[in-house]
Amino acid sequence: MTETVVVTGGLGRSGRWICDRLAESYHVVCVDVDHPGWEIPERDSVDFRAVDVTDGGEIRDVVAEYDPDGVVHWAALPSPERHAGSRVFETNVTATYNVLDAAGRAGADIVLASSESAYGMAFAEETPVPAYLPMDEAHPMAPEDPYGTSKVAGEEIAKMVARRDGVQVASIRPSWIQYPGEYNCRDVATGDLAGGAGNCWSYVDVRDVAGIVEAALDADGAGHEAFHAAAADNYVGRPTAELVEEYWGDVPAECELEGDQSALSTAKADGLLDWSPDHSWREAADAEVAEPNLLAE
């Protein structure tokens, strides 16, 4: 019997890639604030539900209807710069609690969209130098903005649900997500280094994001774990330690970067999820790849 997974934010820019990937082996319930249209035919393996995930009753109803094996919570306000800070924080934290609470009580394994922004570098007024490089998932998290703080709070909710309900919860901390043929990071690469210092010039291809979500769902783990999702290299094409020293004037005392190695280590995902990134800007920036289609062919 095919397992069922509910994906919130499933019609979002990266969410649709996740749904498309999962639909190859799961029955996917694509949840978003709007339905794509009642007269649009669906793929056999995809259902759509219009749900406001800040309303706990709505997401509980969907979880009760489908009794999913897994829930991927990918819906969020993705930046502190487009909405009032209070709205970003309240929306993200409330939605995360509602979705994870419903999923945990239903006994579903969970994959949560966290963020590299939880470390506090991306939106800081003065970008702090990392404590060590490469950064692993144990690196201190000290955000100064509502978005990054909402992600830290979200991971605490994830830990609570894992403890309370005994389900597996994976918090994915993606780097700056890029899309085949549309690598905006390369525009930053040709400009001032300050434009990429907030994540040490790291990035990740959306196809690799979809891959780590699937790997987390398929994993046989327990409790809560956080994982980086990042490409193996930086997007500038120069040694990462050289970029760090040029921008901050020095490198951390503990710096074990080699060449253009990413500042975000993915060794944990490799070890526990058997996942590693497949894509680099060198081939993906100009790649012609069709956008995912969640509708019937």
Predicted ranges, named:
Residues 3-24:
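N-terminal Rossmann NAD(P)H-binding glycine-rich loop of SDR-like oxidoreductase domains
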Residues 51-91:
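NAD(P)H-binding glycine-rich loop region in Rossmannoid oxidoreductase-like domains
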Residues 98-144:
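Conserved Rossmann-fold NAD(P)-dependent oxidoreductase catalytic core, especially the SDR/UDP-sugar
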Residues 137-142, 171-207:
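A conserved pocket-lining segment of Rossmann-fold NAD(P)-dependent short-chain dehydrogenase/reductase
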Residues 146, 150:
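Active-site helix of classical SDR
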Residues 210-266, 271-272, 294-296:
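Mid/C-terminal beta-alpha module of Rossmann-like enzyme folds, strongest
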